[in-house]
Amino acid sequence: MCVESDGCEIEGCSSSDEVHTLSGSMSPALKSRDLHHCRPGQKFHAALLRCRTPLVAAGILSFGNVLNYMDRYTVAGVLLDIQKQFKVGDSSAGLLQTVFICSFMVAAPIFGYLGDRFNRKIILSCGIFFWSAVTLLSSFITKEYYWLLVLSRCLVGIGESSYSSISPTIIGDLFTNNKRTVMLSVFYLAIPLGSGLGYILGSIAKDAGGHWYWALRVSPMLGLTAGTLILIFVSEPKRGSADQPGGRLKTRTSWVCDMKALAKNRSYVFSSLASAAVSFATGAFGIWIPQYLVRAQVVQKSAESCTYQPCSSRDSLIFGAITCVTGLLGVVIGAVTTRLCRQKTERADPLVCAVSMLGSAIFICLIFVVAKKSIVGAYICIFIGETLLFLNWAITADILMYVVIPTRRATAVAFQGFTSHLLGDAGSPYLIGLISDSLQESYATSEIWQFLSLGYALMLCPFVIVLGGMFFLATALFFLDDRDKAAKQVNQLARPPSTVKVTK
């Protein structure tokens, strides 16, 4: 394969070869008289262009997504140490994640609007550089300024929002059909993988550096690397180029028109509500399950309560490893199962999500039944429950790509993120901590009651997961109609502007 490169002769290309442009379209070969030997700078430029392939772009974007979630959950890996240093309770500790998610979801619609209209890779890189700088600076906050740590997490949420809102749409414009499902599966594998690595990184960096501050000084360095790679190796694909090979969608609708269309898209609305249920559970679990398991071991007399820093990182490490493995299994099983089920029914995507959600709720309920007697049993239930829960991440994104036209996808991803965070993990960590604190204040404080109160608060999660399964079943009812409607609109938008009639 040869790459077009400003008339510079590329090694291995002849005058009869077809030349691939960066957008993936084919152009006639350059004639011999148009070719000349490359100067050193042109050779480097030509080599750089050859590296800008869709697979390389998807790999770099997936790496950046891993870092996004790794940074998000690094704080959770050292949460007990933060509580001891700043002397805050469960509700105040949960506030760290809540303000992060609140700023994340408020910024998401703004970045969605920008992502449908401006250069996406520039926005992505700036977002990564911003949150990396803020995270690094937050590692120097002293114990008198807990409010400043809370503010820093708020700012980090804004930076990470740009990435989550825009990067899936680039992959959507690089691939289509089953190949897009596979690439989105790899991309969304970053959610559990990055979350698990966040716990592990936080624990290891704290132990190596002797203080929890060091947990916040690793991901920024990796973030700067990811931002630079995006600028150099990720090209900006034409919007809709995968859906309409060789061209771009020529008509852009207004933001108001986009929002009206999304509000009328029943598959999009119900799948967004289902995503909110998943976010509610994962947000609460990510913050509180390691704490819950520590308290369970204190009750079983297999561990002592942490009084001084540094606290044991064992449970955060184990939970992080489980999250990584279950994330890998969940995303792979979800992608394979969906491809197989598509041979039986065209509604496979939402139905697989619904079944996995309902199955997950059962095993998550069992965590709180067995934790008092067996930590190993609790870990087994966590493993199965998380695997089933993580099945739907990539499938949900693929549902969106099917039912939303390319020129609205960044806005759709952003508002789906806004909805899932607003109704999900924006409030769940704080709500669980608040319920736990309220139960502890109602009765005499003891180690057994600290364990039970947090468990009772976390029991809210399985019921929310069941509700999410119901929303996926509702999505299945409208999925085919909405998918066909979107395909018809894509064909309309690919025509010359004078012949296009946009459905509002």
Swiss-Prot record:
An annotated Gene Ontology molecular function: sphingolipid transporter activity
Single biological process term from Gene Ontology: branching involved in blood vessel morphogenesis
Record field: transmembrane: 48-70, 94-114, 122-142, 182-202, 214-234, 269-289, 317-337, 351-371, 375-395, 415-435, 460-480
InterPro entries documented for this protein: MFS (IPR011701), MFS_dom (IPR020846), MFS_spinster-like (IPR044770), MFS_trans_sf (IPR036259)
Membrane topology: Multi-pass membrane protein
Keywords: Cell membrane, Endosome, Lipid transport, Membrane, Transmembrane, Transmembrane helix, Transport
PROSITE patterns, sorted: MFS
Family annotation (Pfam families): MFS_1
Disruption of the gene: reported phenotype: Disrupted formation of the primitive heart tube.
Catalytic activity: sphing-4-enine 1-phosphate(in) = sphing-4-enine 1-phosphate(out); sphinganine 1-phosphate(in) = sphinganine 1-phosphate(out)
GO CC terms of this entry: endosome membrane; membrane; plasma membrane
Highest rank taxon of the organism: Eukaryota
Subcellular location: Cell membrane; Endosome membrane
Family stated for the protein in its record: Belongs to the major facilitator superfamily. Spinster (TC 2.A.1.49) family.
Task performed by this protein: Lipid transporter that specifically mediates export of sphingosine-1-phosphate (sphing-4-enine 1-phosphate, S1P) and sphinganine-1-phosphate, which play critical roles in regulating heart development. Mediates the export of S1P from cells in the extraembryonic yolk syncytial layer (YSL), thereby regulating myocardial precursor migration.
Name the UniProt record assigns to this protein: Sphingosine-1-phosphate transporter SPNS2
Organismal lineage: Eukaryota, Metazoa, Chordata, Craniata, Vertebrata
